[in-house]
Amino acid sequence: MHDSRVDQLARQLVRYSTQVKKGDRVWIDCFDVPNYVAVALIRAVVEAKGLPVVKLHDTLVSRELMIHASEEQYDILAKNNLDLMKEMDCYIAVRGSHNITENSDVPAKQMQMVMAKMRPFMNERVNNTRWCVLRWPTSSMAQQAGMSTPAFEDFFFKVCLLDYAALIPAMTALKKLMDKTKEVHITGPGTDLKFSLKGLKAIACGGKHNIPDGECFSAPVKDSVEGVISYNAPTIYQGIAFDNVKLEFSQGKIVKATANNTEAINKILDSDEGARYIGEFARSEERRVGKEGRSRWSPDH
């Protein structure tokens, strides 16, 4: 049976998030999601009189490419993607995953090379298109959240089909508070962290770039972060599962990092000179995320 919520979500992404208009070229990027998701997005773009361009991806295929990746190979792929992105007005990505740790055995050196090669493509998308990215609910994600698949799907659509425009007043108030905040002090079990926001403006996010949404974000003054923070929720990064993450800061830099996989997290933090510094601090007005929020399933930027 067709789920009408898929059509609702597609229309929201097209009409509200990316505001597709007549003649807009829209890249629809689907990763491990059912074909009917791409079909719903195509129809929504056509309804808006846009021009859909579709790419379908499979994580197993991508993993194999990365494991055997060469610089020459990804120079070609990166150029191909960048050239196409320069032709686009809008970009919508829907990312599912049958196995959230599928890329866990891709060598870190290979992963870092691929990410570096693809960075100009991502920068073009972020800076020069109207874009929105989101996850697609899968059994793998439901398992991570400790929920049944149907219950997780209901949760997903509940938070993704919000009237995000109605959140703007509350988010505006939060933005004003963050704009005038000079220092943040976070305390909790295993956590005592301080940093400055002085002189840095917050940005309110109302369902335009990431779904689900409802946050205001800023960034700490680079060298102001001091103390320790411990995370009570698991996360997946580059296909590797991390839990019990603890970070210690001095003069803004992570000087010690431990987790269930301490070696892997430090390899990531050593991948470039900026990786040991915090790039974002955010507060959310999204109160509908309850215990399910333990699952780290928000989209990548």
Each model region followed by its residue ranges:
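Dual-mode signal for accessory low-complexity, basic/Gly-rich regions
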Residues: 256-288
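Oxyanion-binding "anion nests"
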Residues: 215-257
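A short, sequence-level motif marking secondary-structure junctions
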Residues: 197-203, 261-262, 300-301
